[in-house]
Amino acid sequence: MEYANLHYVKESSNLERSSTYKSSKIQDEAKQLLYDYVYIKEKLLTTSSNSLTHYQWYLIYKHTCRCFQQVVRIVYWFLGNQVIRENFSIKKRKPHNHIPQLLEQCTCIAESFEGIYTKKQILYFKCYGTFKTWKKIANFPHL
């Protein structure tokens, strides 16, 4: 599953790179990740934490990380090497209007699992973090 996602992102970088294409592709991808996340959240709310096995918790953790990492990959692919800032110029980049919402979704996913990411790391990523820096502070050498 994870290999398929990595392969998809690699392949997608070779496709047409028009703003319209990228914008719709990112929105579709983000929606799917958000649906996955909402499903996990609802599953957790309707399930007693005591009834979940260690392996089930591991799968939830792993999938949450995958959602978060995938959104980071998509945002990075879209913006290239440009620094991702919370208040980047929307006037100059109208197709990018949804990026702040994407980053907000990233934050929601990350903050839902205490101990995975600290708020300081998330804030750093949202305001100043490039992809390379984020990898370093979040310990994602495999990204």
Curated annotation (Swiss-Prot):
Keywords: Meiosis. One of its GO terms (biological process) is meiotic cell cycle. Has a role in meiosis. This is Meiotically up-regulated gene 128 protein. The gene is mug128.
